[in-house]
UniProtKB/Swiss-Prot annotation:
Homodimer. Belongs to the high-potential iron-sulfur protein (HiPIP) family. Specific class of high-redox-potential 4Fe-4S ferredoxins. Functions in anaerobic electron transport in most purple and in some other photosynthetic bacteria and in at least one genus (Paracoccus) of halophilic, denitrifying bacteria. The keyword Electron transport applies. The lineage of its organism: Bacteria, Pseudomonadati, Pseudomonadota, Gammaproteobacteria, Chromatiales. Keywords: 4Fe-4S, Electron transport, Iron, Iron-sulfur, Metal-binding, Transport. Coiled coil: none annotated. [4Fe-4S] cluster binds at residues 43, 46, 59, 73. One of its GO terms (molecular function) is 4 iron, 4 sulfur cluster binding. GO terms for biological process: aerobic electron transport chain. This is High-potential iron-sulfur protein. It comes from the Bacteria. The keyword Transcription regulation does not apply.
């Protein structure tokens, strides 16, 4: 099943969590959380991501949608092994 991509402009959850699709090209929260600085925080290394690979992956914070592996939001939490 192909899920739609979350739209930061229209999705209220994405808006409240300041989701950005490309964290490399956007300004984001520079605060260091855990051991990673803001510049190293992405959806692909977040504990909420639900797949190990893919450019767009399901996220527990955005039910029914996928997020960009290079995205970021305020709820980012470091994914541990």
């Amino acid at each position: 099943e192909d899920l739609p991509h979350v739209d930061a402009a229209t999705n209220p959850i994405a808006q409240s969590l300041h989701y950005i699709e490309d964290a490399n090209a956007s300004e984001r929260n520079p605060v260091t959380k855990t051991e990673l600085p803001g510049s190293e925080q992405f959806c692909h290394n977040c504990s909420f991501i639900q797949a190990d690979s893919g450019a767009w992956r399901p996220c527990t914070l955005y039910p029914g949608y996928t997020v960009s592996e290079d995205g970021w939001c305020l709820s980012w939490a470091h994914k541990t092994a």
